[in-house]
Amino acid sequence: MFKTKSVKNILAILILLSVSVMTSQEKFTLSGTISEAQSGETMIGVNVLIPALQTGVVTNQYGFYSITLPKGTHQVTYTSLGFESYSQTIVLNAAVNNSISLFESTEMLDVVILETDIEKTNIKTPQMSVTTLKANTIKRIPVVLGEADVLKAITLLPGVTNAGEGASGFNVRGGAADQNLVLLDEATLYNSSHLFGFFSVFNPDAIKDLTLYKGGIPARYGGRIASVLDIYQKDGNKRAFGATGGIGLLASRLLLEGPIVKDKGSFLIGGRSSYAHLFIPLVDSGNENIAYFYDLNTKLSYDIDDQNKLFLSGYFGRDTFDLGDVFGNTFGNTTLNLRWNHLFSDTLFSNLSLIYSDYYYGLELKFAEFQFDTGIRNFNFKYDFTSYVSDAVKLQFGLNSIYYKFNPGEVFPTTDNSGRNYRKLTDKYAFENAGYIDGTIKVSEKLNIQAGLRLSNFTRLGQESINVYANDNPIIYNQNLDVYQKATPIDTIAVARDASIKSFLNLEPRVSAAYQVSESSSIKASYNRTAQYIHLISNTSSPTPFDIYAPSGQFIEPQLGDQFAVGYFKGFEKFSLEAEGYYKEVKNRIDYVDDADLIANEAIEQVVLNGQTRAYGLEFLVRKTKGNLQGWIAYTLSKSEQRTPGRTAIESGINNGRWYNTAWDRTHDFSLTAQYKLSEKWFLGANFIFQTGRPATFPQGQYEYQGQVVPVYEARNASRLESFHHLDISATWNLNHKSKKRWSDEIVFSIYNVYNRKNAASVSFRENTDTGNNEAVRLSIFGIIPAITYNFKF
């Protein structure tokens, strides 16, 4: 779809527009870092406005801002959600460094629960399909189970759905969960959920800022084709020791922070653990079951001087699920990140990151007496630059290199009588490299453009043993039986670790534009191409998040996604309206042949085919952002489909080559979120979600063959589970509502699934022993769950 000529055109436009907006008028740069007055924590996304010039800028992920203005006297206003605005007069006869601190606002009436656009500023920005939540915003989201949950918050937005009870992750605009790039302090997390999606892996007390990109993804992000969830942890209090935590019936948490060297260095350490299994049976299985999680967040930060800062952060989390003598399941993420901020000048900011990420997944099948372990590990080097060329032009550029090690599986016998022997599948290795440039340009008072280009390369490295197939075809088609079968390797070869098995190169253009129709409304449009080189091999019908990651290579092509979106944004005095439409195509989405075996499969290429997906939809969001009653209504009408045609004219393909619903297709997705300030001491909250049931494939008949009953299935994903819906309510009792006191605490009363809806996680079929008839059996994970949590902070 994308041609080299188009790349040249985009770069030419970017350069010409950059030159055209610059003038010869004498100008100087105003720059600095914005922090919270109480803690010294740097602030992301603070609006730095110059009203007289109708221009401004926002602070970056490290609280830094830079804007070039004409020589003279300027009134500058600093604003951020939940903080008191600050204005000052600055005489700009030379470059000025103006670092300030903002005080938290004591007035809660006008705190916006959800910040998708700060109207006056972001109506003009070319970015669309973006949602930002800050730390103080997250705290005001209606609380269920005693603590704010960022994943539950984003699944209340249009275009975002949960993966369903009993499943991990979330889905964005008809994409799969593995197509989301989830970052914590720039480190990749491969699983974003705890306890079957009931909790997220993000400790709300440790989070500073969250940004979700559903479309219009900036060029600095790559490697996934559906969305980017970019989360930054707090740095820690540089001025005083403090603690935040909560004690509840289902889980507890504690976070400690304080200065190492006052006003220069700080530490943060926070932990959480659940114990819900002690009180609540998860499934009615007749077996004793255990399900719990724990995680740990850590961070050290140090300001070497005004131009250099160091950060060392980490995360460790584990989930354990044990179902009696049936199976046990353990999985989790580990990350470590060292970052160095350097300010080359008042207009050139840089960040160098060295990142380690690891994901482990273990499954013990007790009835089969063996343990299966798998995982993925990567080492990531990133060097990002931001150049504030002028008040109308900002350039971002950088390099990124990732080294992958894939563990496709390791099998351990768990008893002496196990029929399984120890087996280690061959590890796989790969390099992913990229360079990018992205420019944000104010073309006129009404038109703003963001255009960028990412060049990515993925190289599959050598390994000890590689299968060789006749005609390079690992899957053969049996025309007589109309089935796909595994091809028998004709040989195996060894390739040196530093040699290339297969290499891919992709250009990924990104462009967004905003045209301001009036002071309170704008029209936006965006296009982005993204490439994804790693694939999740997962049985989506499993009640556990069965995860095996595989690299692209000689038999599995990288996924390529193209997305177009248009939107209309309108702000009113107390309300705002956002409407977006999108269309997305993905090439080389893997699809499984019928009866594909995934566990301990040394040759996964023998059970997958390359297909394609498409998704399109309309999204609507109405927000009420002022007054005692605040909240939003979100609705999405969408379609997500997949097709895997035959490779030749005689092959039937998957589902006879016809389009079928993906497992994450939701025709209707409606959510209502509200919070009501009853008094200074009491806050009431409620969430309601309704979604079309998840697609499923059910048998439509059966036959007997050699004494065995064989089910006959209908078209793939032609049926659906029942509609998914539940209502959650909460009441927060603020025990100490006077904001100036150092100690603050509250009690949160909440009920998840008030009317005890038995939402189906899966449906299976069995023979009724009394009647001999087949019957459907629905597995429901969660019913009604009441909870009480005591939260505190000092």
Where are these regions (language model features)?
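Short, acidic, small-residue-rich periplasmic hinge/interaction motif at the N-terminus
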Residues: T33-S39, V46-P51, T79-F83, N93-E147, ...
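Short loop/turn motifs that connect adjacent beta-strands in outer-membrane beta-barrel proteins
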Residues: A163, Y221, G236-F241, V261-G265, ...
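Gram-negative outer-membrane beta-barrel transporters
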Residues: Y583-E585, I604-Q700
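Outer membrane beta-barrel strand-and-loop segments of large Gram-negative receptors
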Residues: N378-K382, K424, E432, P551-E557, ...
